[in-house]
Regions:
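Conserved amphipathic alpha-helical segments that form helical-bundle/coiled-coil interaction surfaces
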Residues: 83-171, 183-191, 200-215
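Structural signature of alpha-solenoid helical repeat scaffolds
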Residues: 174-177
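Generic C-terminal helix-cap and adjacent flexible tail
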Residues: 214-223
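Short linear motifs at protein or domain termini
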Residues: 1-89, 96, 222-223
Length: 223
């Protein structure tokens, strides 16, 4: 299943193409794999035609496996760009709501996440950045802001795109210096939420989203 999924998501198998039958896979295993891929909107079976790759518009793009399979491919770069556009639309408004509605516990949670981000960029020795720790803390920072918004629909939407956000965090954190450069922007968001200044929180998040967009464009640009 994972092998076929990666071939589809990285463009090796294109929409309309017949899905090949691997010689080393049993019929039972293949049938189960195709059942899962069908549920994710990636393939469809037709009588006398076989199983073909469905159009990208049918794919469940926020599915955890679908997100994982497209890492490193051209479609992954396009997905990161589109995800950044979604974040630019949603996260500034979310930060403004959090500045109005965050409880003391919410603020403490966001603050802890920020402190952990700082700690992850202050590793001693050869490793100047603990990428895994930074990504985890960055994820908790943004998830905490979504919860602090007090909007249940927005919170559920945030849970839906969480796996995709982790992909974005991992991609933009790997560039040397990018994580540390983002810290002042995260701090500005936290301070605005603490001070209960929705307009400042919105502006600070917009600044962070602009920074993120630049990092995504650097990833996409030829080296």
């Amino acid at each position: 299943m994972h092998g076929l999924g990666r071939q589809i998501l990285t463009g090796k198998l294109r929409p309309g193409q017949v899905v090949p039958v691997p010689a080393d896979v049993s019929r039972t295993a293949l049938r189960e794999a195709l059942k899962v891929l069908t549920a994710k909107g990636l393939v469809e079976a037709r009588p006398r035609v076989g199983t073909r790759v469905r159009p990208r518009s049918d794919w469940q793009l926020f599915d955890t496996d679908v997100i994982a399979w497209q890492r490193g491919g051209a479609l992954g770069a396009a997905f990161l760009n589109e995800l950044t556009e979604i974040r630019e639309i949603l996260e500034p408004a979310t930060a403004a709501l959090a500045a109005r509605r965050a409880t003391a516990d919410d603020i403490a949670e966001i603050s802890r996440a920020y402190d952990d981000m700082v700690a992850a960029t202050s590793s001693r020795g050869a490793r100047a950045l603990n990428v895994a720790a930074f990504v985890d803390a960055d994820s908790r920072f943004h998830a905490g802001i979504v919860r602090a918004s007090g909007n249940e629909l927005l919170t559920q939407l945030g849970q839906t795109v969480f796996s995709a956000l982790v992909l974005s965090f991992r991609a933009t954190t790997k560039r040397p210096g990018a994580a540390r450069a983002s810290l002042p922007r995260h701090r500005a968001i936290l301070n605005a939420i603490k001070r209960r200044h929705p307009a400042d929180a919105r502006r600070a998040m917009l600044s962070l989203m602009a920074h993120t967009a630049r990092e995504v464009h650097r990833i996409e640009a030829p080296q």
